[in-house]
Amino acid sequence: MSLNVFWFLPTHGDGRYLGSTEGARHVDYSYLQQVAQAAERQGFGGVLLPTGRSCEDSWLVAASLIPVTQRLKFLVALRPGVISPTIAARQAATLDRLSNGRALFNLVTGGDPEELAAEGLFLSHEERYEASAEFTHIWRRLLEGETVDFAGKHIQVKDAKLLYPPVQQPRPPLYFGGSSEAAQDLAAEQVDLYLTWGEPPEQVKEKLAEVRAKAAAQGREVRFGIRLHVIVRETTEEAWQAAERLISHLDEKTIADAQAALARFDSVGQQRMAALHGGKKDKLEISPNLWAGIGLVRGGAGTALVGDGPTVAERIKEYADLGIDTFILSGYPHLEEAYRVGELLFPHLDLAQQPTPLHAVSNAGEVVANRYVPRKVSQS
């Protein structure tokens, strides 16, 4: 099975270490452009743009990067409850047309009650999923060309329609992740690709089986994807050293403060991430080559695959064997790691999209002694 592999645009900041200004870098448009172009150059099929008050707006960033990329797809957030489904559908169709079919959409219900309240959303966890289901129902029908009348518990629209359709037909794909029962029900009923964070394979297997069964009961099939960090080096020993360096500036107070802040979330997925490490630095390899150190201070995806190229590729194939065809990866710092993943990991994977063809003015690598073209090294 060919794999769709995406990268990540760090619109909320980037650096060489977690939880420290040491090795940190300013993230501006020029830097995001570099990361996007590096991802496209290396053969990533798309990029995930994060959402939330700590991030730049994902839609505006994606739109700004369309002219400086050729094939890269942009996975941007749909936010039920903070925007009407009609306006969101219109924006989605426009982004898809402007990018000539390179827009993908990630349904994000939100898991931080404090941040949601700041955005004017005061619904319980259960109510948010009710509203999200109504939103998604309307959004999908509009993009598929229907005129929609809908009277729900949370949303009502009358004679809603789009005058300008999307490029992708019947509509652009819809991604979604969530670990609660309500989230799985929504995924089974309405989304195209269900995302999970990087839990150990056995836990992921159970979760996918539940969603697959729920979808089958609806007469549907759902694709699957996973969100992971990756630390790949020429040797597995070097990769583990890099993992330790990434958290080398974290002290106990920083970890405790981060875990206290994340504990207020009502996201089941976030609770599952926290349970993998328990807020401690001493037992972070939770499954072979799966490391939970990033989750000590980062919300959302908190695990990384660690190893040399063949080892990480083997772990990815274990997830692929569960039915996962889409891998959304990232690494710190995101510019350098995009190249590293492309050079060390991609030769060991069957990719759905290949690196962008280059019209090079010279050979790859520096000429040896002003005479010899560098020899190609075996990937075995």
From Swiss-Prot:
The gene is ssuD. FMNH(2) which is absolutely required for this enzymatic reaction, is provided by SsuE. Its EC number is 1.14.14.5. Keywords: Flavoprotein, FMN, Monooxygenase, Oxidoreductase. It catalyses: an alkanesulfonate + FMNH2 + O2 = an aldehyde + FMN + sulfite + H2O + 2 H(+). Belongs to the SsuD family. GO terms for biological process: alkanesulfonate catabolic process. Coiled coil: none annotated. This is Alkanesulfonate monooxygenase.
